[in-house]
């Protein structure tokens, strides 16, 4: 969570490169307003990133794994219940003694991964991101240009509809 310009509690702010980060975030709201759903969405995202490579494979195994693969849609809206669920995070990584900002996300539906991307903030332009990889099931696009060339063939061979690139 990025810090604002409010100067109260400056001793709690952590500086990573050009970013000022708060070490704690809070979610509050009325009963049944969705606080637990935010936590469940993060848990699902972590689980999918760590385990999606196990969702592919044998057809019989896919049937049992598919129940874990599918996120719970927002059911109070007819358009949303059939739409893909999208998960996206921004994070800061330590890259050779320089803190770099990354953007990672993916969209999934009941057929698997619809879209996946990983971007890195360009060194020269604050706030502008450069693609490390991008894939889109609908268009068939698979751009691995930000990854080492020697890994392209292995990734293309190993990649299944249900698996995320970061899980391989």
Question: Which ranges hold each PLM region?
Answer:
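Residue-level signal for secondary-structure boundary sites
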Residues: 7-9, 95-97, 114
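Solvent-exposed, flexible loop/coil residues
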Residues: 5, 78-80, 137
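Short, charged/polar low-complexity linear motifs in solvent-exposed/disordered segments
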Residues: 14, 53-58, 133, 162
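Conserved P-loop NTP-binding catalytic core
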Residues: 20, 26, 40-103, 110
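Pre-Walker A-like glycine/lysine-rich segment at the N-terminus of P-loop NTPase domains
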Residues: 1-44
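Short C-terminal domain-edge/linker segments immediately following a structured domain
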Residues: 15-18, 28-33, 57-59, 121-124, ...
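Electropositive, glycine-dotted interaction segments
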Residues: 98-168
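Short catalytic/ligand-binding loop motif for oxyanion handling, primarily in non-cytosolic enzymes
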Residues: 36, 47, 114-115
